[in-house]
Amino acid sequence: MKKVLALVVAAAMGLSSAAFAAETATPAKTAAPAKTTQTTQHHKKQHKKTVEQKAQAAKKHQKKGGKAPAKTTSKPTTQPAA
């Protein structure tokens, strides 16, 4: 753990000294930064297709099984004459 801490401290010291050296090595006069032209992009609005609500409601309330159930025909039961 101590070795890791020592490496971190050494790296920080090395970076700070490198930054200090680079800062002092630059000439006193600095050139003005070049102008950058900024272009703005205009995005067109996309019109979404309107969805009919009626169609969705009709789907919800639609009966399942499109055909009516077939009626079963059975012979009427006759009671024997008493």
Curated annotation (Swiss-Prot):
Compositionally biased tracts (Low complexity): 22-40, 67-82
Segments of this protein annotated with the region Disordered: 22-82
Keywords assigned: Periplasm, Signal
Signal peptide interval: 1-21
Pfam families named among the record's database cross-references: Asr
GO cellular component, one term: periplasmic space
InterPro entries with a match to the protein in the record: Acid_shock (IPR023497)
Post-translational modification: Proteolytic processing gives rise to the active protein.
Chain positions listed as propeptide in the UniProt record: 22-56
Transmembrane segments: none
Signal is among the record's keywords: yes
Compositional bias annotation for Basic residues: 57-66
Subcellular location: Periplasm
Location, primary (coarse class): periplasm
Family to which the UniProt record says this protein belongs: Belongs to the Asr family.
HAMAP family in UniProt: Asr
NCBIfam families the UniProt entry points to: acid_shock_Asr (NF033636)
Function: Required for growth and/or survival at acidic conditions.
This protein's name: Acid shock protein
Provenance organism: Salmonella typhimurium (strain LT2 / SGSC1412 / ATCC 700720)
Gene: asr
